[in-house]
Amino acid sequence: MAPQRPKGAGALDVPPALSPAPVPPRSTELYAALDLGTNSCRMLIAQPKGSGFHVVDSFSKSVQLGAGLEKTGRLSRGSMTRTIQALRICQQKLRRNKVRRMRLVATEACRRAANGAEFMQRIQRETGLKLDIIKPEEEAQLAVISCAPLVNRKTHNLLVVDIGGGSTELVWIDISKVPKADRAQSIMRLHGGVHQAKT
């Protein structure tokens, strides 16, 4: 049973659970997740281990991509240059680890900037990485999924607050009607899994 959100709760609308659930990851494969936010660029490369993941490599850099965005409505030349430099390091790590399954996303700064889509094209040209500018709803969805391992059998309601550099997402989910043994897994079904990409 899919987790439910009370009507009128004021949280972001979360789509119903996708069915069937994503195919379980292969233990020999590496997976990567990259989050390009308003202030920082972060990436994790991990390998499935048991019911979780073992981190193989990681990267985090303050790029201040959203610096000056409030005044100009655009990403500045300096912030884009800093970000490109950080993403080149990420690309090298992905290639060195031979990662083929990944999800690379950009959030609020690129959503709001008039030149956000243009910057995504530049990133692909200069680094070979294809980033998706995701909507606030999907950003909130991913935040909820990341909390799934913290959900235990006694959890009835879940409030997730994702505070970023340029936006804050809140999601309230009622999982009281989901069988206790399935509660964490039902949250994982909120998303369609990972993407395969070239580096």
Where are these regions (language model features)?
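Active-site or pore-adjacent capping/gating segments
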Residues: 168
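Nucleotide/phosphate-binding catalytic cleft detector across ATP-hydrolyzing
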Residues: 1-36, 44-163, 171-199
